[in-house]
Amino acid sequence: MKKIAVIGCGFVGSTYILDLLQQGVQADYLLVDKNTNLADGHVRDLRDSKSLKSHNGSTFNVGTYDDLKDADVVAITASIPTVPTADGEVFTDRLQLMTANVKILNEIALELKRVGFKGLSIIPTNPCDVMAGVYQKVTGFDPHKIISTGCQLETMRTRKMISEALGVNSDSVEGFVVGEHGSGAIVPWSVFRVGNVPMKQLIAEGKIKEEYVKDIFSRVVKEAFEIIKFKKATYFGIAESMSLITRAYIYNLNTVLGVGVQLDDKYVASGIYFTVPAVVGKHGWKLHSKLQLSQEEQAAFDKSALNIQKVTKDALDLIGFKN
């Protein structure tokens, strides 16, 4: 069986493992957390859940970094809490988490480098584009074996909102949100389609109101913060996103996903992790064809990319990383 590990056993990490179990992914699961009691509690709970699933030979154990040398997948979900303050205030930009989370990620990266981990690294810890870029620099791991969850959630939310307006299944909505996972995301309406019909045509035919479409971007960006305000954290959606990446990798599905990968020299900020369509299979990821964005969309994409390039450099400086 495959060996799948999660580092950080909070809401996201534990839900990720449960989602894989519910999807029927048989594996030796390892849960790693500084709070070993928390990890042990989840292990016991997951074993109970597995016992009710026939023909599933999965195992669950508390792990250490040394156990991860031969892991196939490691998901890094460790992060500072994103719960609202005592006054009910919620952070409004994922980049606000960088200063604290980069120190946590650096410690984890150095440990995985020490043990010689060679598998796929999945990084949802925010700001995930920056964290993935820092992680690659610190570890020196193959960039194609590092994926940030990127704008996968924004894509899911955009498809959801379009499908609700049109009364169709979200699978019928084609297109990817690209750029930064956060306020710098770009919804390229020029490439979005529903049942192979361009959004522009659907608006012209009166199938969907232009005002509704224009409002989708702000709603997508705010959605996570609304969820955090009401239930203190987001974890169902992001766990499903991580599960999808994991399954594409271990089953060699070669699925095109809108996830954070390292940009090549076709882009203005090459070397950073940023969301573009990528094919995910057993070798990690490879870039899909570059999207043909409108002039306005490309300008927004480039501006956001240059900002992430700067923040990634700032994060590396913060941990004292030198090339």
Swiss-Prot record:
Catalytic center residues: H181
SUPFAM superfamilies per the UniProt record, alphabetical: LDH C-terminal domain-like, NAD(P)-binding Rossmann-fold domains
A matching Pfam family: Ldh_1_N
InterPro entries hit by this protein: L-lactate/malate_DH (IPR001557), L-lactate_DH (IPR011304), Lactate/malate_DH_C (IPR022383), Lactate/malate_DH_N (IPR001236), Lactate_DH/Glyco_Ohase_4_C (IPR015955), NAD(P)-bd_dom_sf (IPR036291)
Pathway where this protein functions: Fermentation; pyruvate fermentation to lactate; (S)-lactate from pyruvate: step 1/1
GO CC terms, sorted: cytoplasm
Catalytic class of the enzyme: oxidoreductase
Binding site for substrate: R94, N126, P127, C128, D129, E154, T155, M156, R157, T234
EC number: 1.1.1.27
Binding site for NAD(+): V12, D33, Y65, T149
GO MF entry, a single one: L-lactate dehydrogenase activity
Reaction equation(s) it catalyzes: (S)-lactate + NAD(+) = pyruvate + NADH + H(+)
Protein name: L-lactate dehydrogenase
Gene: ldh
